[in-house]
Amino acid sequence: MGYTIKQKIGICLKAEANPEMTQSDLALWAMKEYNSERPPSQTTISRILNSKNDIISRKESEFELIRRRKRANPLLRRILTEWITQANWEGIPITTPIIQSTANAIWTRLPKEGQEGNGIFNQKWCSHFVKKLNINITGSPRDVLDNRGYNLNKVWKLDEILELKRYLRDIIDQEDYAPQDVFVIDDFQLFYSLPLDQIFDVSSIDKGIKQSNSSAEHSLTIMLGCNIDGSEKLTPIIVGKYDKFDVSKSTHVSLNSMQFDSVSYQTLMNKLTEVYNIFYKSNTNKWITSSMFQNYLTRLDHKLSNSRPNGRKILIILDDCSSHRIINLKFNNIRLCYLKNEANHKNPYNTTYSGIKFDYLPMNFGIVEEFKILYRLQQYLEMINLQRSKSQIDSDPMIEENLTSTSVATTATALEVLSESDYHISLIRAIEWITRSWHSVSSERIFSSWKKTHLFNLLDWPSGNSGQLVYLNQKLNTFDENKSLKKLKEVMSYLNVVIPWEIDELVGLVNERGKVTLSYASIEEIIDSCLSEPVDDYDEMGDDDGRFDNRKNELGDVSSVPVDNSNDPWFTVSEINEFHNDPFYNNDKSIDAAAEPLESISPDNDSSAIPGLETKALSAISGLGTTSTSVVSDSPSGTTQKYNNISTYPNGSLKHKLGVLENWNRKRGPGQGQGQGQELQNPQGQQQQEQQQQQQHQMSGYNFSPISNIESPIASGGLTNPNVQFGNGAGSFDNQTPLFMNSLTSPPPPPPVPVPVPVPVPSVPSQVPATSFPQDVSSSRAVRAPMSTAAVDVDMATAITKLLEYSASNTLKLSQSTIDDLDYNLRVIRARLNQR
């Protein structure tokens, strides 16, 4: 017998709730559950599970279908559905002649391969099409009554805050929502392959100018969601430009061995969802369309029905951008609350657009910013290690001439400035970083963001059950909100660049803050957003007989796949020790000791996202000390510095101009350069660290079990299975160091250091007693004598002259503003040299 869509959904949900069941077990369960004469074949079960993401998102109107007929013009139907959805939300009247005219206009704009028929659509076709859409935006009278007298598509404006707070309190009390049942959803752009050196053309991203095709290719739209206490995070949606892409650089063995061009789109997407617990979609504009969002919520609604005996009901707060305007707001287990986004600009690319969002979405009060900081931190660590691997350890003769016998004999290492192509990040690597960053956002950060909205009285929850919120509120007393920002700022100083980013600009890029889907979308925009998106032609496979095997119900038993860490950038300390055979990486030294002072800022913050990534940053910084004591870059902007104030920069707003020489040279004085790190001996801590590393190596996949928020309902009704490895947020990475050693060649041994003559500034001892701890990260670095002023000027003038020569010969592409800045700096330096 054939199975209906509803029965197939039941099979998929049963498989996800019981991952230990084999396909033969599922077949026997289906026969008993649905009173079949015989169990379905192995081929049938396999096909159902292979299309489970598509099947679970089916609407109720399709529940009784067994086979769905292949329909004509699937692309036109998708575009017309998007247009009708937007028109209904905007209150535009829709009649049959208007639908006929719009359908014909869409048909003429489609590429030839997407056109079917003659482009003429009669009244019967239009009537049947609208009926199948099942439009329900405002809700029935009963739905309005249950919604406290408001339409389902009610959008709450900024000046309705008091009425909104009363509505939320009444709804929570009426439906008995716990804090864990209230979620927020928001989407934003991420330029995942952004060059970290502003000498390259990044003005279109930084200043809000409309991007060119080359820069727009390396951006993604990401949708994130979480509840109030941060205990559950919804599965992210990631939308890119390409439906299939190279996955050979994945750190997961089942992906890096896959030939993406030889597998089907469905197989690749299922594997990405299985490994990273994300939904990847694609279209030309990289938009989350309303159809995507409708399917996402429908899938979530079906899983909520299966999470508890009587289902679980949740409330989702979101803004009213066009992506969230769906055609049917009636769900069995989900209630949507729309907030007006006052930053409703038709053209967010306008240079005067500030990107400030006047709303009450918790995502805009620190969650998205924290996510981007954690992503950029991983990007900087990757580039620092790439730069280190490409740089040659050569001494500058001019520096050697100015070094006296009282100076530290270790010369500076000139780190090679990376090219624009070096900053390219593969899409699969970006997905891994996105997943890691989202899982590393702590519950304290999430709760703090909800608290800042003042939408709820979190300590006096209407339906009770506020014990966890009281606990989180107490932990906020020791929670350092700027900890991740400080760490990113410190790590940024170790990347040698020509024109560095300012941290506020990097985290708050205009085109990342602005939504391109805020207002009503035109037909042309809708067509672009639907092109290249895989089209569902509603063609179901039939039942085939076949023999059973005892394969798992997913694409494969991931837990049994061997782990291949050869391409994993997050190597453990012991592996780096073995690779380098360097005194710095001695096994009897603990790399975590340097992080102790920073971690002591928040001793009770066990689930903070920063300790783990912070330790990796410190490890990377200390690792640089093995080959470098201070960086004399090719330009003064690239000189590594450490600033104690987040908002203070050496040159203020004139970041492209040289600061006062005395101030600039003082920052490069003793104790300010990169020095060889001194570590503490802690054999007991090292032994515990190695044991934890062995446990991590036994894990499968990308060194974590993705938080299966909506994937595996559990008996308690939660959307998330307990995840031991991510129990401490990013602290789970404490015993790993993020040095990318895959393409690194072993560095030559450091030059012998003669016994230095005592100098006024004492140097760091080579061995620190185990009972003493450094008070600051910079205290673990060696001391370097300052360079003479003349030597610095000559070095800078030579470097700037070379840059201008490269630009004149088109070897290096520089913007005109950068060339003007370099000319200005060169004139200042030459004038200063002529005065001596």
Swiss-Prot record:
Alphabetical UniProt keywords: DNA-binding
Biased segments, Low complexity type: 626-640, 677-698
Gene3D superfamilies documented for this protein: Homeodomain-like
Residues annotated as domain HTH CENPB-type: 64-139
Pfam family, one: DDE_1
PROSITE patterns: HTH_CENPB
Region (Disordered) location: 626-732
Biased composition (Polar residues): 641-651, 699-711
Keyword Ubl conjugation: no
GO cellular component: nucleus
Role description: Essential for the synthesis of pyruvate decarboxylase.
PANTHER family: PROTEIN PDC2, TRANSPOSON
Name recorded for this polypeptide: Protein PDC2
Gene that encodes it: PDC2
